[in-house]
A protein has these predicted regions:
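Conserved catalytic/ligand-binding micro-motifs in nucleotide and anionic cofactor chemistry
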Residues: 2-478
Length: 478
């Protein structure tokens, strides 16, 4: 046995003994446990129906991830919950907050964008919206990407011709703008449409966003007939074009086969890595798709990755009524109960059958997941090569996982700003970028003192590591 193997074996025994010593006090209740390393950094968070029985399993024969993890455990914490579903929710919240090394992590976890119908103005408008407050106004979505929102907004603008300008721009207009000239706005700002007629357009938008496309088409057909009988063929033609556009949207919706709001989740594996493709359908309309590449350890299987993804995804995102999966999870009823507690929604989780009208959609999702994963692995290989070159160039002892690059800028000492760019195994990580407004210039740091500015930026950055140890850099370039 080598010295390294002996030390690892001793650490495993030490970790097991620590857990064994705590077992007597651990209750036989549901809850969440946290394993911490020598620096009191949380390295794993788990949930259990019975905390004592679950922790006892770590004192027996272990393999893979668990062996390595137990060798690093110096502290153990736990929290009791009133049910297993509550433990599942708490586990997801803590994983999202602390990002432990040995848990499956959802990296790209931005909130989904919506289309919002603003109702706080005399002439409402459709806008992009990203946030959690879905109370004021009427919302359509969520969408998988901002691009999908922009495409849909453009289509709705062509059909309903609601204003798209800001409130100040609207109130300052004396004559119609270009949007009116290209037939994408009804120009309420200059009275080209009456308030009554504009409100009717708004009501049509509400009907459409509620998924009642067919009833809206029927209503418009009646109006078109009425205009034709009055020999008002210009208005009848406008409504005819609107019906055609809505019919096209309806045709696209019918190809999905989904009546209820649905989230379709497909997972695929290649060379030990996973890609999860999420397709969103709301009110019968496709709202786009997005690939995710969760971080995980080598011995975590498809079901475990899928379970972790579901709970982390829906921590702050509202689920659809139906969640259709490409692969099964161990306890779908537990997840259904947890989502009910979290969002107050009755959710149905099931594996999509291999035959049927919607089976083809799952096959498309799986194929897209495979293509996205292949591209992801190619990009990862390029990034790894770049990191290896950095390691060689600067004679680093290990491959860096997080590189931070700093610089600052100012205009003759004024408007000083510092910037941090972050790169790692997945390339440049834009969500980790930071800007620092230099505060010290108010305390005699001015006149273009770059060293003083960098000192302030680095002091502020490093002071945050106490609360964010998982963001510790392996290498800094200044």
């Amino acid at each position: 046995m080598t010295q390294y193997q002996k030390k690892l074996s001793d650490n495993i025994l030490s970790g097991k003994e620590l857990i064994r010593a705590r077992l007597e006090e651990v209750p036989i209740q549901p809850g969440v446990y946290r394993m911490l390393d020598i620096d009191k950094k949380i390295i794993y968070i788990g949930k259990a129906k019975n905390l004592k029985n679950r922790l006892k399993q770590y004192t027996g024969d272990l393999e893979g991830k668990n062996l390595t993890m137990i060798s690093l455990v110096y502290y153990l914490e736990y929290s009791v919950t009133d049910s297993e579903s509550s433990a599942l929710l708490l586990e997801g919240q803590l994983i999202k907050k602390f990002k432990p090394t040995f848990n499956i992590l959802l990296k790209d976890d931005k909130s989904f964008p919506y289309i919002k119908l603003r109702l706080d103005h005399e002439f409402p408008q459709l806008i992009k919206y990203r946030g959690k407050d879905l109370k004021e106004g009427k919302f359509f979505g969520p969408f998988a990407s901002v691009k999908q929102v922009e495409v849909t907004l453009l289509e709705l603008q062509k059909i309903f011709k609601l204003r798209s300008c800001s409130d100040p721009y609207f109130s300052s207009r004396k004559r119609p703008c270009l949007q009116y000239q290209i037939n994408r706005c009804s120009a309420p700002c200059t009275g080209k449409i009456s308030k009554e007629d504009y409100d009717e357009l708004v009501n049509q938008v509400k009907t459409f966003l509620s998924g009642k496309n067919k009833s809206l088409q029927h209503l418009l057909a009646q109006k078109m007939q009425s205009f034709s009988e009055e020999l008002n063929f210009e208005e009848a033609a406008k409504i005819r074009d609107r019906i055609k556009a809505l019919s096209y949207i309806q045709l696209k919706a019918e190809t999905t086969g989904f009546v209820k709001d649905t989230d379709l989740i497909a997972i695929t594996e290649l060379n030990g890595e996973y890609c999860i493709e999420l397709y969103i359908y709301r009110a019968g309309q496709p709202c786009g798709n997005h690939p995710y590449f969760p971080e995980h350890t080598e011995d975590q299987n498809i079901s475990e990755v899928l379970e972790a993804f579901i709970m982390q995804l829906y921590q702050d995102k509202i689920p659809a009524e139906n969640i259709l999966l490409s692969h099964s999870i161990n306890n779908s009823k537990l997840f259904t109960k947890a989502l009910k507690e979290l969002h107050g929604i009755n959710v149905k989780i099931e594996v999509l059958k291999k035959s049927g009208s919607t089976a083809n959609l799952m096959q498309i999702a799986l194929e897209n997941a495979r293509i996205a994963l292949e591209q992801h692995l190619k990009n990862s290989a390029k990034n790894r090569y770049a990191l290896e070159e950095v390691q060689k160039l600067f004679n680093l002892s290990a491959l860096p996982n997080r590189i931070e690059v700093y610089d600052n800028s100012h205009i003759q000492g004024a408007f000083a700003i510092g910037a941090m760019v972050v790169a790692g195994r997945e390339g440049f990580d834009k969500k980790e970028y930071r800007l620092f407004t230099i505060k010290g210039q108010l305390q005699n740091i001015g006149g273009g003192d770059d060293y003083a500015m960098l000192r302030e930026v680095l002091t502020r950055r490093l002071s945050r590591l106490k609360n964010e140890p998982y963001r510790s850099p392996d290498f800094m370039i200044i």
